[in-house]
Amino acid sequence: MKEITDLQRKMLKKYHLDAMVTMTPENITYVTGAYIPTQVTVRSRKVIHIITEKHDPVVIVVNIEEPIMRAQSWMDPKSIISYNEFTQNPMMIAIDKLKEFGMETKRIGMELSYLSAIDMDLMHRELPHAEIVNADAAYEEMRFIKMQFELDRIISFASNIEEVIYGAFASARAGMTEKDIYRFISNGFAEIAKGDKMSMPMVGSGVRSCLLNGEPTDKVLEKGDIVRVDVMGTKDNYYCDCCRTAVVGTPTEHQAETWSKLVKAHDDAIAQIKPGVSTKTIYDNFARQFTEWGFKPVAFIGHGLGLTLHEEPYINTYKDTTLRENMVLCVEPIHVIDGECGYQLENEVLVTADGHRMITGTRHPYQQLATIRADG
């Protein structure tokens, strides 16, 4: 895709790089359009993409996955190089290609947070006069702003995720287990994802709702339990991430009031989202509000979403990113009452030219705490 290639070359100039060597699964998918499944499950099956200012990009892929690369990728078929994983070292093929491109004394950007020590040593031995630098920031910046095809995938997928969550709440009863809720969610997810996968199943009830990423167990749902459900998964390689909280039976006054405050924190944060706004400002306003209520602010209340579940920009106090049009954010304030329960509300939001647009949170009203039947 020309837009991706042009964007990479823009990053080459901005970060003063002569070449970019891409290896992480998410960035391989971004720069090639193909998802190679065994790149994740078999670590030795490297996929390596190389681009320079003057040379057309090439991609190196294990021979058994070459058909997938050819079928899914927008790369020129002539630029796809396959290797035998038992007789060839893909890093050496990449190094030879860099030499062919005249990169022996140039500045080469790589994802050093991903590159193994063995591969880094090989790069230094074979290209002793090249400058190998960390290009993680360049990749983060490339994926900050979503292209239209990315937005189409994210929005189409996420638009149905609320139905899955509220369908599970409607099917659940006191006396069932967390695993029963997960089964309802899994079945609903399979229907909308059409073959793609759910990751990190998060269902927690009662005191287990305090566990931010707790997997479902055989714990039985009891009247009065707070139940927190976070649905995360992929379709066409792009993530959805949406969370809701419910109570088994009628909420107490305390539960309803706590939820009302969480909704206000969530809505106030989203109301600030528009191009030019500082993520740190959004977080600091949230933290001030939570502190006034006597709640403990969590470390972040939002993150980017796309080919990975959590990506830049984060909404926290540690980084200050200026929001730009076509960023996709998840806004997710969380309130945990230690030893008792945890409340969370999460929605996906698109930054638009003049403000924002809710991607989730439009199908079912979230202003009232959702309920699960307590009559068994």
What are these regions (language model features)?
Residues 1-376:
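Active-site neighborhoods and metal-handling regions in enzymes and metal-associated proteins
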